[in-house]
Curated annotation (Swiss-Prot):
InterPro entries: Uncharacterised_YqhV (IPR020390). The keyword Transmembrane helix applies. The chain crosses the membrane at residues 15-35, 48-68, 72-92. The keyword Cell membrane applies. It is a multi-pass membrane protein. Pfam families: DUF2619. GO terms for cellular component: plasma membrane. Its main location: membrane. This is Uncharacterized protein YqhV.
């Protein structure tokens, strides 16, 4: 496995790993919805996903921004932070 992933930046690998984890959680939730075959339970599972999705997004963005923070000015970091906040506000309202 090290041979296959040897040239990949560790930060990019971490970010991609978080996205794979997120997709596994989503797939598991879909299977749970199908197995339970109940709308009420499906809504509960879906509400849990509403928490997991933004959490993975925030962690992934934090990992990436932490890695490139030294290369960016404070103004650009503020713009990125503002953009992330606006994305989260748009999703939840």
């Amino acid at each position: 496995m090290k041979f296959l992933l040897g040239n990949i930046n560790s930060t990019v690998l971490t970010m991609a790993g978080l996205r794979v984890l997120s997709s596994m959680i989503e797939l598991t939730a879909a299977i749970v919805m199908l197995v339970t075959n109940d709308v009420r339970k499906a809504v509960v599972v879906n509400s849990i996903l509403a928490i997991v999705g933004p959490l993975i997004f925030i962690i992934t963005m934090t990992v990436g921004i932490y890695q490139i923070a030294g290369q960016l000015s404070y103004a650009k970091l503020i713009l990125i932070f503002t953009g992330v906040v606006l994305i989260l506000a748009g999703v939840h309202k």
